[in-house]
Amino acid sequence: MFVALPFLIFYASFSLLLGIYDARTGLLPDRFTCPLLWGGLLYHQICLPERLPDALWGAIAGYGGFALIYWGYRLRYQKEGLGYGDVKYLAALGAWHCWETLPLLVFLAAMLACGGFGVALLVRGKSALINPLPFGPWLAVAGFITGWKVFFPDG
């Protein structure tokens, strides 16, 4: 556990930073998503080397899954429905959570985002439809909810 503590702090700090940054600006910059991705792979290399292949597949699945959604929507509607920062952030979360947790993480993030959007509609009315809803904060919250499996695999 003591070896994993710096990684836990790193993960929590960068996920919190990304969630807040995306909520304020609508952006998930590479300077935050890339270190989070490499940190997840390094965590598995040092603390759980037997899970490193699952972490690599998690990063690939996270990136590939959201990239398909991004490009499919963009080609169909000629505009972005999902930012490319979200694609890279899910790749980073995949590196931390491994591929098995990603479906639950994405489902939770989508449900949280729907709930947040519903609250925004109730509070602001139709003006909530004008600005796009950042998805990064919901990915961050879902990552924290499912994160117990990453840092406490035996518990």
UniProtKB/Swiss-Prot annotation:
Source species of the chain: Salmonella typhimurium (strain LT2 / SGSC1412 / ATCC 700720)
Any single Gene Ontology cellular-component annotation: membrane
Family (UniProt): Belongs to the peptidase A24 family.
GO molecular function list: aspartic-type endopeptidase activity
Domain of life: Bacteria
Protein name: Leader peptidase HopD
Coiled-coil zones: none
InterPro entries xrefs: Peptidase_A24A_bac, Prepilin_IV_endopep_pep, Prepilin_peptidase/N-MTase
Disulfide bond entries: none
